[in-house]
Amino acid sequence: MGIYEELVARGLIAQVTNEEEIRSMINDGKATFYIGFDCTADSLTAGHFMALTLMKRLQMAGNKPIALIGGGTTMIGDPSGRTDMRKMLTKEDIEHNAACFKKQMDRFIEFGPGKAQMLNNADWLLNLNYIELLREVGACFSVNNMLRAECYKQRMEKGLSFLEFNYMIMQSYDFYYLFQHYGCNMEFGGDDQWSNMLGGTELIRRKLGKDAHAMTITLLTDSQGKKMGKTAGNAVWLDPNKTSPFDFFQYWRNVDDADVMKFIRMLTFLPLEQIDEMGRWKDARINEAKEILAYELTKMVHGEEEAEKARTAARALFAGGSDDSNMPTTELKAEQLTAGKIAVLDLLTACGLIATKSEGRRLVQQGGIVINDEKITGIERTYTTEDLKAGLKIRKGKKVFHKATM
């Protein structure tokens, strides 16, 4: 089975410009492809998994990845899938975020001469002459066609700034530049990027008279159609300082039964034959499949040692054991207490378990907070310095665990 056929079997491909040519190129290891990452945060998220694992699979098959950091396009902001305008970042913020991305990508793909490259489109976009760009590139784009693009439709009623309207042209120029200077013949991206990607292939055809190709990756969604990568409205980060390895493990361990086999097929590197066999598992073995999913992904992001720790801690908690050594922990300071005490809502806030006091009240009223096996029934509950020194094991809902110490 060639790599293209494997991508199809794993359900990773959404749309392609020319299936036969793309199949031939990537199966023969002749593709130099790029995927763009707008560095709007200082960490990648679980939502980037599809792109990262695709780059790894294709590199293993002999193809050359280019991870393109959007140092220039991030200054504009991609309107795709947005109903509002993205926050604009400083050049320093973007450079810092790019460095963080590189560190995380190192776990997935191998960088170096003749291997993967990381480039920053600020290196060519920030030096463009506006008049020259309009004459050489702008003339190749139809405004009528651009306005029909899916990436702009959601913004038309609320208002689409001219700044954002240029995003498609900038992304297309990236592909054109990479084709000329790096031999990049293929662009991969999320399914919501299709219009932008077609703009790049068309620009190359019109300016250079050559063929380039585009392929979109299936968006990672659950059985309800919701994008994966967030929990309770918060991103699931790949940075262990933002989402601990334990919380990362638990996120995947707690996916719906209906989703687990799809995610194993799409995201892990387990052989397809093994996955087909797992697909016949039922009842209690579904939980075993969830643990395998969580372990494989945590190992990929945080390493085998952290994955083992997270699995051990999760098993202990599930079995009602006392091993909380690998549980996410917050160490409180004396100044966070008042007269040697802290109220339960302040405790939950300090541990990052609630965003607002009203959320905390609602959780308490619904019986969703358990501390040291005691279900909290009132917000007047307080804890002392001695309680914290002994350690407080907090459970939020059924699946979120945290420890508070002092």
What would you call each of these model-derived segments?
Residues 1-193, 198-201, 207-213, 226, ...:
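NTP-dependent nucleotidyl-transfer catalytic core
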Residues 204-406:
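Conserved nucleotide- and phosphate/pyrophosphate-binding catalytic cores
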